[in-house]
């Protein structure tokens, strides 16, 4: 949990109970503070408080989803960071409203419950699956939108001209024109364009989060060594792809690893074998300039969940035994926990090209199909100031908590952030990665 609560202390012989002032907020690196102020218009304390508020709301939403399934209609932070809980008409609405107000949250009356939206989501999936290929090719993705209380179906601009019309029974679906994005990195790979595929599966699940916390590896809050390798630092995969390190951690056998993006590995089929892709420091290894190697890809996944596990060579393992992320050459940010994505929550991403850039989450549990190369399912979308090729695999945080790994963006050809504009970044939730690899852990305080 980010932040602290006041502690009640009784001094020997004292007649009064005194409240100790709250501890100061964790110190944030200057590069991150600048990004928070520039991109979010928040102070560091406001950013940390809003991130914590979001995680508290996630846990409350999980309990509401289980206790009041007939009326619960989603939860989010509004533009001012106010926690909102949607409620639809149902036999349990009065009790649900009492629970929301008792928790100090605001209620928004909505027309459809989350359960009804999930049912419509399944019908939409079936409808897309049965479309002829010349029409399904214009569908780019879909997700439940708790704020608008509907389903956002994203298509390309040519969809309506090709006769793509929603049937009457899909009454909760809102069509949005525009591509869902393309691969934002690696820098030496040609940009990947999106193609179509059903944006949802036949078996729909509630957009809930795992209430039991995944295991973490605890480390002491000590500053990193001068030669330490941190999340956000650049690396090269066999000289073919330049990416960013993600979160440091350990695997099921206790080996030191770094968790990055799966599509950064150009030979993913060889992961975990003697022919596995070698990871090199920096982004200049091209076969002629040999920067030092630091590990090999032990596991690579690009289908549905985009992640890689880079097993660190024993000779340099000590350099990765830390829980920090940063922009290359900058001061470190300690990772203190693991978080869930929530619409409206503040996020900041670190990458070796764009550095720290911040924004808010606009979608959760979204599916994105990128050519024949990879598919993202249950990804979250953050609208951030800038994302550049080379940022893939880098860490996405909310507050000081690990949230996800950068996977794709909709500005793959942007060269720099000099004329930065807000862009969408798709990220794979860190909890989805840990669930897909038993025993994998993220280092935290």
Positions of the model-derived regions?
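Serine endopeptidase catalytic core focused on the charge-relay Asp
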Residues: 227-368, 397-399, 403
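Short solvent-exposed strand/turn elements
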Residues: 259-268, 315, 373-390
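Non-catalytic extracellular/periplasmic "stalk"
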Residues: 99-100, 109-186, 220-259, 297
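C-terminal subregion of chymotrypsin/trypsin-like serine protease catalytic domains
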Residues: 398-445
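Short glycine/threonine-rich beta-strand-turn micro-motifs
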Residues: 27, 31-34, 38, 48-49, ...
